Amino acid sequence: MATSHEDGSATHPNYYYYVDPSLPVYESQQPNPVDDLITIYGLEEVARQVARTNADGTKAVKLRKSYKNQIQDLSGRFITIPSRENGKGGEISDVIFQNNPDMMNQAKLVEGMSEEEYRDAMMKRDTGLFEPPQMDWDMCSTVIGQLMKSHPSEFKNSGFDVDDLAFDLNGTGTKTKKRKYKSNGSSMASPNTELQPDDMKRRRLE
């Protein structure tokens, strides 16, 4: 059935102002973006673990979990094992042993060297980190052997000094003296002044 205007100048089909019935029927998107997608996909527990606030409105104590923390509950381990191939191996040795790469025995793959020879050279370079003069095992044994469960005041009586565990960053073997600060009467301390109790109180008030 057609619909015509009052002037009769034009005639249009019934669906002119609506939807063409010959076209496919429109289907709404599923699931609807305005629906509760967390409930639909069963993510309530995950959402609770990463929520910034608790259900009662209080601030959550734990930090939001990263992807690595999320998968810790799964069986198996998903941690990359450090190795030379992935570039994650040997990064901490320079920190622990204070080795300058230029002073370490270098193992280079030269022409004519077999794969086994190169592997042996790399092994010798790594084991050299734990041999004298890189490591003083006698000193380590003495210091670590004194770390027994006891009152802190007993450490010095047994010959233990906490400075023995410190790194000799300047390579001189001497202790660095800390600069003392003296108060000049102001609430702000200069490098040549020492903080007094009154100064600390002023800083707290400020």
Swiss-Prot record:
Domain of life of the organism encoding this protein: Eukaryota
One cellular-component annotation, GO: core mediator complex
Subcellular location(s) per record: Nucleus
Q: Which InterPro entries match?
A: Mediator_Med19_fun
Locate the compositionally biased regions of type Polar residues. 183-195
Q: Does the keyword Nucleus apply?
A: yes
Q: Where is this region: Disordered?
A: 171-206
One Pfam entry for this protein is Rox3
Molecular function GO terms recorded: transcription coregulator activity
Q: Per UniProt, which keywords does this protein have?
A: Activator, Nucleus, Transcription, Transcription regulation
- Record GO biological process: regulation of transcription by RNA polymerase II
Q: Cite the record's note on assembly.
A: Component of the Mediator complex.
Q: What does this protein do?
A: Component of the Mediator complex, a coactivator involved in the regulated transcription of nearly all RNA polymerase II-dependent genes. Mediator functions as a bridge to convey information from gene-specific regulatory proteins to the basal RNA polymerase II transcription machinery. Mediator is recruited to promoters by direct interactions with regulatory proteins and serves as a scaffold for the assembly of a functional preinitiation complex with RNA polymerase II and the general transcription factors.
Stated family = Belongs to the Mediator complex subunit 19 family.
Protein name from the UniProt record = Mediator of RNA polymerase II transcription subunit 19
Q: Which source organism does the UniProt entry give?
A: Kluyveromyces lactis (strain ATCC 8585 / CBS 2359 / DSM 70799 / NBRC 1267 / NRRL Y-1140 / WM37) (Yeast)
UniProt gene name: ROX3
